[in-house]
Amino acid sequence: MNRTSVGEVSGWVGLARSTFYYKPLPGRRGKKPSTHTLYKGELVSNYQVIEAIRSLISGPYNAYGYQSVNEDLRELGYWINEKKTYRLMDQHRLLLGKVIRCQGKRTWVQYRKITASKPLEYLCLDIKYVWVHGEGRWYYLLSIMDVFSRKILHWIFQKSVRKVDVINMLRLLHLRYNLKGVIIRNDNGSQFLANQVRSLLIQLEARQEFTHVATPEENSYIEAFHSILQRELIDRYEFNSYYEAKRHLEQYMQWYNYQRKHKRLGRITPHAKWMQGFPCSAVKQSDPVDVE
């Protein structure tokens, strides 16, 4: 049996010999995007760059595009080009002109300061970034507080907080407490603006209200809690891993709710204030903090 070499066959059909051996690989071609950026001579996580970008464009009238942001980043000491700046801003929905379109009109905050006369009258929620030193990246903490008692009813700590996480959290809270008639205050984050989140709250007969842009004081209770958390826990520890950070958060939340006394509550704990609102309900008094 006569055999013909690959080179001969390739020559007959007019193809390069290398074509025979080529096997395309799955996934996108080219070099993988970098996960770190050079900052003042040291490699830092891209999450630090993203936080720097958020800070640069945080002003209420700031309309910087990615090119202006790139110039500012380089002035701060980041060794980064426009292409990478664009990619990071695009991935995190920070590009100018990225508009979140939601169905129906938003109900805006009417009164800057919330006055709650009972538990589950007002809830407020917000997202905070927590730096995990050992992994060189940020994690997201979503907390929801009962305004009357300042008690943290639920919190989520993970790599990202999506609309599905907010939906699951609201469903869990509804099963435990019944959110009918509850007013829920939040900022204008994409997770809270999502049509599915707004539709769920309508279905649960809860009322959602949005703070005005660049007015964190309208959500002052949860903002104050996150400031306390920053001062009493995050600034005092360097977390080596996600699991270590989560363990510290679990312990802190328990301590905050059940042991930390608040001057504005009359020198009692959030849980004690919560109990005052349910003098005849053992179920409401004993509800623990939910952790995910």
Please identify what each model-predicted range represents.
Residues 177-194, 216, 266-271:
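Acidic/histidine-rich, metal-coordinating catalytic segments
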Residues 6-13, 69:
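Short alpha-helical "recognition helix" segments of helix-turn-helix
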Residues 115-117, 134, 215-218, 239-247:
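Conserved, non-catalytic sequence blocks in retroelement Pol enzymes and Pol-derived host proteins
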Residues 59, 79-143, 164-172, 176-181, ...:
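Mobile-element integrase/transposase regions
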Residues 146-156, 169-172:
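Electropositive, glycine- and tryptophan-enriched low-complexity nucleic-acid-binding patches
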Residues 99, 184-188, 202-221, 237-242:
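RNase H-like polynucleotidyl transferase catalytic core
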Residues 195, 202-206, 228-292:
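C-terminal domain-tail junction helix/linker
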Residues 19-121, 215, 269-278:
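Basic, flexible linker segments flanking DNA-binding modules
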